[in-house]
Amino acid sequence: MELTGFSRFHLKGDSAADWLASLVTGNLPRVGRIGLVYFASAKGKVLTEMSATRLAEDEFLLITGAGAYWHDRDLLNGYLPDTGDITLTDTTRDYATLLVTGPKSPAIIAAASGLSTAQADFPWLSHQSCQIAGCRVTAIRVSFAGEAGWEIHCDMADVVAVYDAVMAAGAPHQLGHFGMLALDSMRLEKGYRSWKSDLTSDYTMLESGLGRWVKFDKDDFVGRAALQAEHQAGSQRQFVTLTLDDPVDGNADPFGEAVYLSVVQCDGVDAGLVVSSGYGHRVNKSIAMAVIDKDKLASANQITVTVLGRPRAAHLVPTHVVYDPNNEKLRG
């Protein structure tokens, strides 16, 4: 899959790590690793999500969605100090990205790059530099699809040669193409969030179920005071992942899925709204992510989601992960 639309920012400087750490709610990845980082407002609301690839102690590649380009560029530049010891370079138009993912991807990447792709040598959420078709690339072991996979980042001028080499290496493994609708279905199965649907400033980090990325034991960060107060008092709303039963009403469309802002009810009372939904083809289930009233959820005997004007019975997924909850395939 071609993902050149990613927005990319290269961050470097003697105090780059300290500066970035003061903006994000969680910890930064170690050198050689990649991790998700979240930016909150002063009120603790979700502003954006980025992946941070740590190239050196004070050097990072920040990657965010295509649709978030202007928002995230302005967000980063707005916080950038004028001390001159940090540089933030927009490299969005300089690089291309290919995503190779699936159970055969370790063999394909190994054949194309010459790297050992064994988990011990190239672990999940790490990156390495290598060459493919004589072109320098950065291979990052991560996949939004929830399978073993790599993002291959290369110079824009090299992408055709790199693509041809990857396809040639994948030919014995029946490597094919897939698109954004398939990727969106697969990320729902894994409980992965999407900016401006699941990740919006309508909700706080804690309401959005992102508490594991909020570290109160680190130095101060934007939104800490508000999130600390919410943590102590308790959130009023809760992020949930639901699976929906098949329709039992003969008039219901069996192929209908919940849509954005579909109503979620607890025991027949409006309790929240769907923020993402779709059909998971690997698990054969209709999936919806929603934010709902915490008290109503706690006492609910039945949860329903309105689909095409009719209620569909829904069931909580405590882990938020419907497919491969232990991430065994990601490490495969």
Predicted regions, residues:
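Basic, glycine/lysine-rich polyanion-binding surfaces/domains
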Residues: 1-332
